[in-house]
A protein has these predicted regions:
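Generic alpha-helical hydrophobic packing signal
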Residues: 17, 25, 63-66
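A short, exposed loop/beta-hairpin motif centered on an aromatic-Gly-Thr core
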Residues: 22-32
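Short aromatic-glycine-(Arg/Gly/Cys) micro-motifs in beta-strand/loop hairpins
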Residues: 6-21
Length: 67
Protein backbone atom coordinates (compact mmCIF):
# COMPACT_ATOMS: atom_id res chain seq x y z
CA UNK A 1 0.00 0.00 0.00
CA UNK A 2 1.49 3.33 -1.06
CA UNK A 3 0.71 6.16 1.37
CA UNK A 4 1.71 9.80 1.83
CA UNK A 5 4.23 11.15 4.35
CA UNK A 6 4.35 14.89 5.10
CA UNK A 7 7.44 15.90 7.08
CA UNK A 8 8.21 19.24 8.69
CA UNK A 9 11.25 20.33 10.66
CA UNK A 10 10.57 20.51 14.40
CA UNK A 11 11.57 23.69 16.25
CA UNK A 12 13.54 21.70 18.82
CA UNK A 13 15.32 19.67 16.12
CA UNK A 14 14.39 16.57 14.22
CA UNK A 15 11.22 16.13 12.21
CA UNK A 16 7.48 15.67 12.66
CA UNK A 17 5.59 13.45 10.22
CA UNK A 18 1.92 13.10 9.27
CA UNK A 19 0.16 10.48 7.18
CA UNK A 20 -2.92 12.36 5.93
CA UNK A 21 -4.79 9.23 4.81
CA UNK A 22 -4.97 7.85 8.37
CA UNK A 23 -4.11 10.88 10.51
CA UNK A 24 -1.17 9.11 12.18
CA UNK A 25 1.69 11.31 13.35
CA UNK A 26 5.14 10.71 14.80
CA UNK A 27 8.58 12.26 15.13
CA UNK A 28 12.24 11.38 14.72
CA UNK A 29 15.74 12.81 14.71
CA UNK A 30 16.42 12.19 10.99
CA UNK A 31 14.23 11.96 7.90
CA UNK A 32 14.91 8.22 7.64
CA UNK A 33 14.07 7.61 11.31
CA UNK A 34 10.93 9.74 11.07
CA UNK A 35 9.66 7.90 7.98
CA UNK A 36 10.38 4.53 9.63
CA UNK A 37 8.49 5.64 12.75
CA UNK A 38 5.57 6.76 10.58
CA UNK A 39 5.51 3.38 8.80
CA UNK A 40 5.35 1.61 12.17
CA UNK A 41 2.69 3.94 13.59
CA UNK A 42 0.56 3.68 10.46
CA UNK A 43 0.87 -0.12 10.33
CA UNK A 44 -0.27 -0.38 13.95
CA UNK A 45 -3.17 1.98 13.23
CA UNK A 46 -4.26 -0.07 10.21
CA UNK A 47 -4.16 -3.29 12.26
CA UNK A 48 -6.77 -1.80 14.60
CA UNK A 49 -8.72 0.22 12.02
CA UNK A 50 -8.49 -1.48 8.61
CA UNK A 51 -9.41 0.77 5.71
CA UNK A 52 -9.36 0.62 1.95
CA UNK A 53 -7.38 3.60 0.79
CA UNK A 54 -7.65 4.15 -2.95
CA UNK A 55 -7.46 7.92 -3.33
CA UNK A 56 -4.43 9.91 -2.27
CA UNK A 57 -4.78 13.45 -0.95
CA UNK A 58 -4.00 16.37 -3.20
CA UNK A 59 -1.04 18.16 -1.65
CA UNK A 60 -0.46 21.79 -2.60
CA UNK A 61 1.00 24.97 -1.16
CA UNK A 62 -0.58 28.36 -0.57
CA UNK A 63 0.51 31.77 0.64
CA UNK A 64 -1.02 33.88 3.40
CA UNK A 65 -0.26 37.40 4.55
CA UNK A 66 1.61 37.44 7.84
CA UNK A 67 1.67 40.56 10.00
Amino acid sequence: MLLTAVLTAAEEGGFIALNPETGTTTQGETVAETVQNLKEATSLYLEEFPMNIHAHPLVTTFEVAHA
